[in-house]
A protein has these predicted regions:
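Positively charged n-region of N-terminal signal peptides that target proteins for export
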Residues: 1-6
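Bacterial N-terminal signal peptides
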Residues: 7-20
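Folded, non-transmembrane soluble domains that reside on the lumenal/extracytoplasmic side of membranes
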Residues: 24-140
Length: 140
């Protein structure tokens, strides 16, 4: 009985140690960098190009960069954590201003619900605090 308990404890320990390795797969930024990154394939090419142009124009007019990312899977992350990590990894926004916004969309799948999150750079938190970003998602 004790050996069975030890085997079970070792198996649980190995499973727990492997968790951080599973939840590490954030996508690399496309090359050349884009503002619309449709990894889930939700948009057709015309929609993607149209949205990309609108976001480029918005960036040019306001110096605020908005990046849209769609993914099929959050790889074990909570939506907020995934979006923030991706926001940081890609460096969304102007250097020194940290004024970027990352909009994350994970569509529903047969085995999971759809999720979305808006990650706002520190330079914009006074304009778009987390509560406002949450309300935007709730209304849409």
């Amino acid at each position: 009985m004790r050996s069975l308990l030890r085997i079970f404890a070792c198996w649980c320990g190995a499973a727990l140690l492997s968790l951080p390795l599973v939840a590490q797969q954030l996508p690399d930024q496309m090359s050349p960098p884009r503002l619309v990154n449709d990894f889930a394939g939700l948009l057709d090419e015309a929609q993607r190009r149209s949205l990309e142009q609108k976001l480029v124009d918005f960036d040019r007019e306001t110096s605020t960069q908005i990046t849209v990312v769609t993914v099929d899977d959050l790889d074990g992350y909570a939506p907020a954590d995934y979006a923030q990590r991706l926001h940081d990894k890609w460096g969304v926004g102007r250097k020194g201003k940290d004024n970027g916004i990352l909009i994350l969309v994970k569509p529903s799948q047969p085995d999971s619900r759809g999720e979305a999150y808006i990650s706002v750079g520190y330079g914009l938190e006074g304009v778009i605090p987390d509560i406002t970003a949450g309300r935007i998602l709730d209304q849409e």
